[in-house]
Amino acid sequence: MKKKLYIKTYGCQMNVYDSGRMADVLAPLGYEPTDAPDGADMVILNTCHIREKAAEKVYSDLGRLRPLQAARAATGGRMIVAVGGCVAQAEGAEIMMRAPHVDMVFGPQTYHQLPEMVARAVRGTGGVVNTDFPVESKFDSLPEEGASPAGPSAFLSVQEGCDKFCTYCVVPYTRGAEFSRPAARVLAEAARLVADGVAEITLLGQNVNAYHGDGPDGTTWGLGRLVRNLAEIDGLARIRYTTSHPNDMDAELIAAHAEVPQLMPFVHLPVQSGNDRILQAMNRKHTADDYRRVVERMRAARPDLALSSDFIVGFPGETDQEFADTLRLVTEIGYAQAYSFKYSARPGTPAAAMDGRQVPESVKAERLEALQQLLTAQQTAFNTACVGRVQPVLFDRRGKKPGQLLGRGPWMQAVHAEAPERLLGRIVEVRIADAHANSLSGTVVVGEHVHAHPVAPETASAEAGV
């Protein structure tokens, strides 16, 4: 008998990938994905612990599930409620205490054991908590991906965990030590995805450019070598990777940006702060100038490269002048996109124990607004610089308007255009006509093959007057 499975995914692309693999693990038990929790036989909340608000959202959602679970029980049925991901890893016991109707709690390294957990939950032997780091890698036990990809783009996990131990971050504690999948398995999974119609693969890892997987030739492969071998898969038109660390941006990977046309000219390279004292307090293990030099080398290899980044404002002890150093770095680098946040203390991290140095919320809010104004101006200028130029766009879904398709260009901008549905899944030249805050729109080019690039982000910053 078929059963309905509803998975709600919070946070990063790695969680999106993990949710798909959870569905693969549960498929042999008869579970099929459904789009809503109402009527589901199992609900999994695949959680994120990066920010406090994300964690509290989980408890709010668990409260909304309780009456659904009770209603099912009243009719003689059962809804299994499970919490997975990083909140589960960090707060397993607290989840069971605050939400005793939860049947299962499991971390991101143990979801391959879901069949055993489900059996225990069904037997009714109490809440199941499985947050230990297993000796065996989950990748050794996961089945091949089951359902066909939902579109022409797919995520592929190649690396997990982090050994950097930034003082504000919970990832080393929730995801564990760095682990790289063997290159042969990555290549085989990528080949299967391409055979199923995928044209673009994004390689995932908490610290993806720290990838050092066992190669089929007996040597250790870095991410650059992995990218080169992926590019040899016939039909794989685009390769991306995220998230990267400046210290792991080695010469081999930078050279791949210059020499592998399938590797897209867009990189997410977090820096967090532009001030050296704050970077040291964060345990980032690099200076602002180290970051500048990495960016310079990358742009020398690929002049049309665009960057996005992460920034934290109001880190404990941050002064006005130290925040000004971040604004200066942003102005110098120029970003096509960026993500910025107020510092949020995560329990158990060293930064949370920096008593007496916490920045007032009002100051954090002022700094965040100033930074976001600068970043928005840069993004607007970058998008505006694309107008009149032609981009190859991978159409991956229908747009909101009839007859409209939506896709992404090389620099990750969403691009809208009127186009027939037969172009879904194809890379098509689009002449950009209009730039919007978070997207572009244009017209499909017929009989023209121009791969012009937008101006470099530095120029975009100057045009924005920042």
Curated annotation (Swiss-Prot):
Name of this chain's protein: tRNA-2-methylthio-N(6)-dimethylallyladenosine synthase
Record domain TRAM: where: 384-446
Family to which this protein belongs: Belongs to the methylthiotransferase family. MiaB subfamily.
Binding sites annotated in the UniProt record for [4Fe-4S] cluster 1: C12, C48, C86
Species of origin: Rhodospirillum centenum (strain ATCC 51521 / SW)
Organism placement in taxonomy: Bacteria, Pseudomonadati, Pseudomonadota, Alphaproteobacteria, Rhodospirillales
Complex and partners: Monomer.
InterPro entries: Elp3/MiaA/NifB-like_rSAM, Methylthiotransferase, Methylthiotransferase_CS, Methylthiotransferase_N, Methylthiotransferase_N_sf, MiaB_methiolase, rSAM, rSAM_horseshoe
Catalyses which reaction(s): N(6)-dimethylallyladenosine(37) in tRNA + (sulfur carrier)-SH + AH2 + 2 S-adenosyl-L-methionine = 2-methylsulfanyl-N(6)-dimethylallyladenosine(37) in tRNA + (sulfur carrier)-H + 5'-deoxyadenosine + L-methionine + A + S-adenosyl-L-homocysteine + 2 H(+)
Keyword flag ATP-binding: no
UniProt: [4Fe-4S] cluster 2 binding residues: C162, C166, C169
